[in-house]
Amino acid sequence: MAMIKAQELVSSNSVVVFSKTFCPYCTSVKQLLNQLGAQFKVIELDSESDGSDLQNALAEWTGQRTVPNVFIGGKHIGGCDKTTGMHQEGKLIPLLTEAGAVKA
């Protein structure tokens, strides 16, 4: 059930950040996306009744257990280092634009 929920969240939102409220890396990714003016959905796993199940499903699906777990345009991006690295390489904004999360 958690896998289906995770997949539905990813497929119905241009950008999804699976996060935890106390995680500084999650905060960094959310701040970056906000600075870029991106529209994104945040799922705080520690605030969801099925957060643990969702995290297990994400680990099974992506091979990544840690948060943040970022998806853009239905594609798994990764965590904080991967997301910020893509931005530093100039690859994040085009991906966000293509996904419809930021205006071109």
Swiss-Prot record:
Coiled-coil stretches: none
Alphabetical GO biological process terms: cellular response to oxidative stress
Cysteine disulfide partners in this protein: C23-C26
Pfam families linked: Glutaredoxin (PF00462)
Assigned keywords, A-Z: Cytoplasm, Disulfide bond, Electron transport, Redox-active center, Transport
Superkingdom in the source lineage: Eukaryota
Location in or out of the cell: Cytoplasm
InterPro entries to which the protein is assigned, alphabetical: GLR_AS, Glutaredoxin, Glutaredoxin_euk/vir, Glutaredoxin_subgr, Thioredoxin-like_sf
GO cellular component: cytoplasm
GO molecular function, one term: glutathione disulfide oxidoreductase activity
Listed transmembrane segments: none
Domain Glutaredoxin, first and last residues per copy: 3-103
Chief location category: cytoplasm
Signal sequence segment: none
Similarity comment: Belongs to the glutaredoxin family. CPYC subfamily.
UniProt function note: Has a glutathione-disulfide oxidoreductase activity in the presence of NADPH and glutathione reductase. Reduces low molecular weight disulfides and proteins.
Name used for this protein in its record: Glutaredoxin
Organism: Vernicia fordii (Tung)
Lineage: Eukaryota, Viridiplantae, Streptophyta, Embryophyta, Tracheophyta
